[in-house]
Amino acid sequence: MGMSFSHLLIVLLIIFVLFGAGKLPQVMSDLAKGLKAFKEGMKDDGNDNDKTNN
């Protein structure tokens, strides 16, 4: 029971209404930066564990 295309469209429409057309690019940019920082943090955390185990 995954999200269908119509569900995704509704979610995107709600986001568009909440943030407006002007702010949406900034919100998406901030979200992408946050995800990138999270992934780098997870990668760095794994590297720290390898160093402490040796």
Curated annotation (Swiss-Prot):
Keyword Cell membrane belongs to the record: yes
A molecular function (GO) held by this record is: protein transmembrane transporter activity
UniProt keywords (A-Z) are: Cell inner membrane, Cell membrane, Membrane, Protein transport, Translocation, Transmembrane, Transmembrane helix, Transport
Q: Where in the cell is it found?
A: Cell inner membrane
Q: Where are the transmembrane segments?
A: 1-21
- What's the short name of a Pfam family annotated to this entry? TatA_B_E
A single GO BP:
protein transport by the Tat complex
Please give, as recorded in its UniProt entry, the membrane topology of this protein: Single-pass membrane protein
Free-text function comment from the UniProt entry: Part of the twin-arginine translocation (Tat) system that transports large folded proteins containing a characteristic twin-arginine motif in their signal peptide across membranes. TatA could form the protein-conducting channel of the Tat system.
Give the multimer and partner information: The Tat system comprises two distinct complexes: a TatABC complex, containing multiple copies of TatA, TatB and TatC subunits, and a separate TatA complex, containing only TatA subunits. Substrates initially bind to the TatABC complex, which probably triggers association of the separate TatA complex to form the active translocon.
The family classification in the record reads:
Belongs to the TatA/E family.
Identify this protein by name.
Sec-independent protein translocase protein TatA
Gene coding for it? tatA
